[in-house]
Amino acid sequence: SFLTQLELEKIPMIDKAGLAILGNDNFLLESLNKKKGQSYIDDYVAWTISSSKCLGLKVINAGGSEVFKQGVQSFELDDIVPTYGVSSRQILKALNKANENLKIEHPLHVHCNNLGMPGNVKTALDTIDASEGRRMHLAHVQFYGYDDKGKRGFSSGSSELSEKINKNSNITVDIGQVLFKPTVTISSDILRQFNAKKHAKPNKWIISEVEDGGGGIVPYFYKENNFVNALQWVIGLELFLMIKNPYQVFLTTDHPNGAPFTSYPELLRLLMDLDFRNSQISKINKSAV
């Protein structure tokens, strides 16, 4: 974390900050397993934030990196982490309570389980319910806006997800819009990156498993004639346009996972210019519209 702060200091002009990542580390999981209590976890979170000098707290696929070591490929909110006997939901709720108890200004920043998987909109909806009214920020929700209907088993769940967000003022989100171009996906969600490596373009990738987490770097090319990519593009725009409160939704491409941040002008035009948006819709895979 010290080296990270030194590197951030070298970046000029823009505001920058870090989020400390917990949710797959032995200390937390063991504390939950041994029922150490919420105040014990609060102290651990406080020490982590203070030591790392971070702005807030993030959880990435709570328990997912740990179950990856057991050969698991998907992990639901109520699935149990082997060895520790705690569920992803328990991890999430404990960290969210700590974030609230410590009055950390940034809400718990959540990378939900089952990113990129058909039907994962249910996971996102369950995660919102797990907040129990506490503040929570869901990251790159476009990647959780997927239902599993239709003959291809992949469809838009944006209507259901946006409706849920509209009804829960404690929730904020950023979109993680996909745009059609080559990019590189970088994530600490090792389950997702391991599953995605077969789609690497070019076919070079890195997967790293470490004691308290993991992740990977996988290059990818989003193409407008690809059904899945086109539907991802549509779902992101639908979420932008159907979430009613602009203070609940943040404009992002989840740089660089959906697209590089240099694509923001294109994204802004897509949202603000109906004629341009319609012209771009006419170019994508027709099955996705």
Predicted regions: what they are:
Residues S1, C112, M242-V249, H255-V289:
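Active-site microenvironment of metallo-dependent hydrolases
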Residues L3-Q5, E30-S31, K122-T127, E266:
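A short acidic, amphipathic alpha-helical/loop segment
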Residues K36-N61, S65-V249:
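Histidine/acidic residue-rich metal-binding segments in metalloenzymes
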Residues A17-D42, T83:
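Active-site mouth loops of central-metabolism enzymes
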Residues S1, L22, I60:
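Conserved residues at the C-terminal ends of beta-strands
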Residues S1-I11:
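Metal-associated gating/positioning segment near the N- to mid-region
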Residues K16, L22, L57, H111, ...:
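Divalent metal-coordination and catalytic microenvironments
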Residues F27-L32, P182-K197, E266-A288:
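Internal, charge-rich low-complexity segments
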